């Protein structure tokens, strides 16, 4: 049986090629807004530039087009002047920031169960990525696979995802030294 969730994608037809881009939830944009507020930046003006408001961000099920999501992030990075804003946003996210996925993680009995839960349900939090997972004798290996071209926000997104994964999985196992190695396809940042 195939299930198609049509509300999650915006299909744009250009010539004969269909470009499918996801519609994005706004719950993490609210975290960026809070980060900007804490640093004395005008988040209302930032949102207004993209025809958004604080109230819209908190409407359940509110979605924006990927292009708008991308432009919001790029503008926030520029406005904040922080190259590490992705990891800063990741640090802001507690396990319960991830809605029902976070609450389900709280009930996992093992690291393996938590990783498998994240792998299976990450799509309810972001349509941009999925996770791969394998285990060998000494380690768990989590891979992050882009489902769409997110080149312009890749560093921000990967950093925030890795930090929030580290934090959430640490809650499950009770200690915070889980990630021993992080390999990425972009240069190592100075921070």
What are the residue ranges of the model-derived segments?
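Alpha-helical bundle regulatory/interaction domains
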Residues: 111-191
């Amino acid at each position: 049986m195939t299930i198609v969730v049509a509300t999650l994608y915006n299909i744009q037809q250009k010539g004969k090629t269909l470009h499918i881009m996801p519609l994005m939830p706004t719950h993490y944009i609210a975290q960026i807004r809070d980060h900007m507020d804490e640093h004395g930046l005008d988040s209302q003006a930032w949102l207004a530039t993209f025809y958004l408001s604080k109230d819209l961000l908190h409407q359940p099920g509110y979605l924006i087009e990927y292009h708008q999501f991308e432009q919001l992030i790029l503008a926030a990075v520029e406005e904040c002047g922080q190259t590490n804003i992705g990891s800063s946003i990741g640090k802001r996210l507690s396990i319960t920031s991830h809605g029902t996925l976070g609450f389900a993680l709280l009930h996992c009995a093992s690291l393996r169960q938590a990783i498998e839960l994240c792998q299976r349900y990450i799509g309810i939090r972001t349509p941009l990525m999925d996770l791969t997972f394998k285990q060998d004798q000494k380690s768990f290996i989590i891979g992050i696979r882009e489902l769409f071209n997110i080149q312009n926000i890749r560093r921000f997104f990967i950093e925030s995802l890795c930090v929030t994964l580290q934090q959430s999985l640490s809650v499950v196992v009770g200690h915070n030294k889980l990630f021993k190695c992080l390999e990425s396809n972009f240069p190592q940042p100075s921070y």
